[in-house]
């Protein structure tokens, strides 16, 4: 797939690098020359422009990409303006980062494909990680595969294994369950 990422701060630059490493074509955009310089050899193309300026934005191949991601963080006004300009220019698939509830509410009015809340998602992931890693025993099969034994987290109680979406959400496959002295495979 082909992406434009506008805003190459911490979040946007990691997003650009990771998508590029997965083989996607990434075009990075930022006003900060240093941020663009850091990524120029890691992504397909980069632009040093002010995406809040409609004329500057017109140099980007907006119609030739699958998704435009607005990764601008703390500059609420810039984020909203860029999203509005993208909509005005007929960009079909827009993802935008929201840094708080008000920002998210305003972005929802644009009817975007996705509103990204990385701080919230990171906190939820950490809670799940902490919840799962209480009393974990593991055995490494190879660099990518482990067998892990852990006590059932309280949040799993009352659900069927199929309802937990462990494989889809965490790439975890249940190979056995132990209840009391009984082993279920």
Each predicted region: which residue ranges?
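Conserved small/polar residues in nucleotide/adenosyl-binding loops
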Residues: 184-185
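Conserved acidic E/D residue at the C-terminus of a beta-strand in Rossmann-like folds
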Residues: 30
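Short alpha-helix immediately C-terminal to the canonical SAM-binding loop
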Residues: 36-37, 104
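Aromatic pocket-lining residues of Rossmann-like dinucleotide-binding sites
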Residues: 19
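Glycine-rich Rossmann-fold phosphate-binding loop(s) that bind the pyrophosphate
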Residues: 8-9
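Phosphate-bearing ligand-interacting subdomains
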Residues: 42-126, 132, 151
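N-terminal Rossmann-fold NAD(P) dinucleotide-binding loop
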Residues: 12-13
């Amino acid at each position: 797939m082909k992406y434009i990422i506008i805003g190459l701060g911490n979040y946007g630059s990691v997003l650009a690098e990771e998508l590029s490493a997965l083989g996607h074509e990434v075009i990075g955009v930022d006003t900060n020359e240093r941020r663009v310089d850091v990524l120029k050899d890691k992504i397909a193309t980069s632009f040093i422009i002010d995406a809040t300026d409609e004329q500057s934005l017109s140099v980007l191949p907006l119609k030739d990409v699958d998704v435009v991601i607005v990764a601008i963080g703390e500059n609420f006004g810039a984020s909203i303006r860029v999203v509005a300009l993208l909509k005005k220019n007929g960009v079909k698939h827009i993802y935008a980062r929201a840094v708080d509830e008000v920002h998210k509410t305003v972005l929802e009015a644009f009817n975007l494909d996705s509103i990204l809340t990385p701080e919230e998602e990171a906190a939820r992931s950490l809670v799940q990680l902490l919840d799962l890693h209480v009393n974990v025993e593991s055995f490494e099969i190879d660099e990518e595969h482990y067998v892990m034994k852990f006590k059932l987290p309280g949040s799993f109680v009352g659900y069927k294994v199929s309802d937990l979406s462990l494989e889809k959400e965490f790439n975890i496959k249940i190979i056995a369950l132990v209840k009391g002295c009984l082993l279920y495979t």
